[in-house]
């Protein structure tokens, strides 16, 4: 009895599968699917396998050698004012027309480049802005004579024309020469002072005030005044 039930169940299952196969065949369309136009291919596995000036880049479905963006000619303009830190471009090729992707402080934006010929009209080129922040000195000792290591608000750099001065007085000059050899004491070597000489300025040893000779009989009071005994 058990075997008869199993045989009947298998027969019913086979009949159901046959009906499903026939129904599916009625909805199937003739013909074969065309091959994929851009099958995923690994045409490179690293930059070293690509020709010069090409890089192994992903396509989203494989990798292929592609040209490296070379950028556009001409120069970026100088930063005129501080900009917000936004990146509106990555390379020159991401900018429209002839615009160039330039760094403006902490911002990257598409701007119209300038030509070196235009800068040459004013007799040379302006130095690039010290951005990002740079530490151009470690202390006053790392700066030239007459300069001081100062904060720029975005790093430190050597700046001249620092107010200062050295002790001593300038000697009396009899001959006046219109030659400027210094501007301030710090322009002179150690032990010298920048002194006027007629219509010029020279580095000369200063005249120091004479030292006060103390008499053994003199005493110094608590208020730093000398007390000299009357004979």
Curated annotation (Swiss-Prot):
It comes from the Eukaryota. One of its GO terms (cellular component) is extracellular space. Disulfide bonds join 33-57, 40-61, 44-56, 50-65, 76-102, 85-106, 89-101, 95-110, 126-150, 133-154, 137-149, 143-158, 170-195, 178-199, 182-194, 188-203. GO terms for biological process: antibacterial humoral response; innate immune response. The lineage of its organism: Eukaryota, Metazoa, Chordata, Craniata, Vertebrata. One of its GO terms (molecular function) is serine-type endopeptidase inhibitor activity. It comes from Homo sapiens (Human). PANTHER family: WAP FOUR-DISULFIDE CORE DOMAIN PROTEIN 3, WHEY ACDIC PROTEIN WAP. This is WAP four-disulfide core domain protein 3. Keywords: Disulfide bond, Glycoprotein, Protease inhibitor, Repeat, Secreted, Serine protease inhibitor, Signal.
